[in-house]
Design a protein with these regions (language model features):
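Short, compositionally biased strand/turn segments
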Residues: 1-9
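Acidic, Ser/Thr- and proline-rich intrinsically disordered linker/docking segments
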Residues: 9-75
Length: 75
């Protein structure tokens, strides 16, 4: 199973479940809390999955998008 690690211990999502990568904004905090339970330190991006969950990431959005694009292209 190909997993995208989001920069926090134990927090990964399946590449196949990624729907979008957003820049972090405080207005997304409520959605992050619903998915993860709290807003961790150093959030730079938010990964939206096909089930509508908003997951925090300490990676920059461009880094996540590059890794996601490589996975979609077959590596």
């Amino acid at each position: 199973m190909d997993l995208l690690w989001l920069g926090y211990d134990g927090l990964s999502v399946r590449y196949a479940d990624v729907k979008a990568v957003l820049f972090y904004r405080p207005t997304l905090d409520g959605r992050i809390v619903r998915a993860y339970g709290h807003v961790p330190a150093n959030v730079r991006a938010v990964v939206v999955t096909t089930d509508g969950a908003f997951w925090p990431s300490s990676w920059r959005p461009d880094q996540l998008r590059q890794r996601w694009a490589l996975w979609r292209g077959g590596g």
